Amino acid sequence: MSINTSGKITSATERADSADFRTIIRNKIPLMDVRAPVEFGKGAFDLSINYPLMNNDERADVGICYKQNGQEAAIKLGNALVSGQSKARRLTQWQTFARENPQGYLYCFRGGLRSQTVQRWLKESGINYPLITGGYKALRQFLLNELEQLALHPLTILAGNTGSGKTPFLAHCANSLDLEGAAGHRGSSFGSFVTPQSNQINFENKLAEQYIRGDFSLEQRLVLEDEGRLIGSVHLPESLRNAMTLAPLVVIEESLEYRLEQIYQEYIIKMTAQYQAAYGVEQGFTAFSEYLEHGLFKVRKRLGTQRYGQLKEIQSTALTQQNKGQPQYHLDWLKPLLSEYYDPMYQYQLGLKSDRVIFRGNNSECLAFLRD
């Protein structure tokens, strides 16, 4: 495929529409989503970008027209709404995407009129661009089926106290999946990131995409981090959750000092940098402070009113000192939070499933065990 001097994409062999979802996901093929923004916001795919045929209001008007007057009238209204300058602007977006992503595909909800319309208008402009057969709905169903396959694998669950390094540990395991990465949340009261968390549909899509790209054989054992039913605001697929509750556990054991340093770097140093990169130094520090305060507030009932008040005061002092260039003061409230709240809670939870523990050790020992 090439682009000629007139800017039109030409090809000796025109690319066909595709239902080869596995190859599309595995190879990270760019996708152009022509659904309305409201649809895209409810759920999309990892490498998709939204260049809609109709905006939200136009889609709603066409939908009402379809219900009241039928398909022919709805198509006529759609053509009237997307015409002139609005059509030209959108066509330019589609053309640019096609030129920049000659290996890509486009899709609407079911692979019907909307994607076919965009495909036809592109063709009239000299660009032959294929679509996803069955659209979003078909690809979404494929990913849901893959999640069911994931739950059939033999699993090993990686457990350990807060700060033991479970998530970075997974990066060293070729046969692992990062549930928290797919969820966009680290699972604890302080687990949110600067960017908003994935919604449920996007979490499922991202997890399935990650699984497909791992190209695992069905008999291959997978390593997953120990998680509750919820990771932030999203929940694990039921079949996967059920499989995880029966799987053997490998427990990382590291000292309080080691874990405290991990927490300090991850939740203080890195999060400060991320907030300030997103919002600027002053606004970023304010947002970071609110993030920490909110995290502590969420565990106030478990701490008790008096202890929460004490740690809140220490945290406030630490933020003041950090703003003066001394972030190490955060250790004064992080240490008791770990030793008095997170450690007892996690040890209680681990005690309920101690019969499933097959190995305990530090990071290096656990990694060696899983590689054997």
Swiss-Prot record:
Recorded catalytic activity of this chain's protein: 5-methylaminomethyl-2-thiouridine(34) in tRNA + selenophosphate + (2E)-geranyl diphosphate + H2O + H(+) = 5-methylaminomethyl-2-selenouridine(34) in tRNA + (2E)-thiogeraniol + phosphate + diphosphate; 5-methylaminomethyl-2-thiouridine(34) in tRNA + (2E)-geranyl diphosphate = 5-methylaminomethyl-S-(2E)-geranyl-thiouridine(34) in tRNA + diphosphate; 5-methylaminomethyl-S-(2E)-geranyl-thiouridine(34) in tRNA + selenophosphate + H(+) = 5-methylaminomethyl-2-(Se-phospho)selenouridine(34) in tRNA + (2E)-thiogeraniol; 5-methylaminomethyl-2-(Se-phospho)selenouridine(34) in tRNA + H2O = 5-methylaminomethyl-2-selenouridine(34) in tRNA + phosphate
GO MF term list: transferase activity, transferring alkyl or aryl (other than methyl) groups; tRNA 2-selenouridine synthase activity
PANTHER family, sorted: TRNA 2-SELENOURIDINE SYNTHASE (PTHR30401:SF0)
Enzyme class: transferase
Taxonomic lineage of the native organism: Bacteria, Pseudomonadati, Pseudomonadota, Gammaproteobacteria, Alteromonadales
EC number: 2.9.1.3
UniProt similarity note: Belongs to the SelU family.
Database matches in PROSITE patterns: RHODANESE_3 (PS50206)
NCBIfam families (alphabetical): PRK11784.1-3, tRNA_sel_U_synt
Alphabetic keyword roster: Selenium, Transferase
Protein name: tRNA 2-selenouridine synthase
Parts of the chain that traverse the membrane: none
Gene (name only): selU
Keyword hit for Nucleus: no
Self-association state and partner proteins as the record states: Monomer.
Domain Rhodanese: 25-148
Record GO biological process: tRNA wobble uridine modification
InterPro entries the record matches: Rhodanese-like_dom, Rhodanese-like_dom_sf, SelU
Residues spanning the signal sequence: none
SMART domains: RHOD
Functional note: Involved in the post-transcriptional modification of the uridine at the wobble position (U34) of tRNA(Lys), tRNA(Glu) and tRNA(Gln). Catalyzes the conversion of 2-thiouridine (S2U-RNA) to 2-selenouridine (Se2U-RNA). Acts in a two-step process involving geranylation of 2-thiouridine (S2U) to S-geranyl-2-thiouridine (geS2U) and subsequent selenation of the latter derivative to 2-selenouridine (Se2U) in the tRNA chain.
Active site: 108 (s-selanylcysteine intermediate)
Native organism: Colwellia psychrerythraea (strain 34H / ATCC BAA-681)
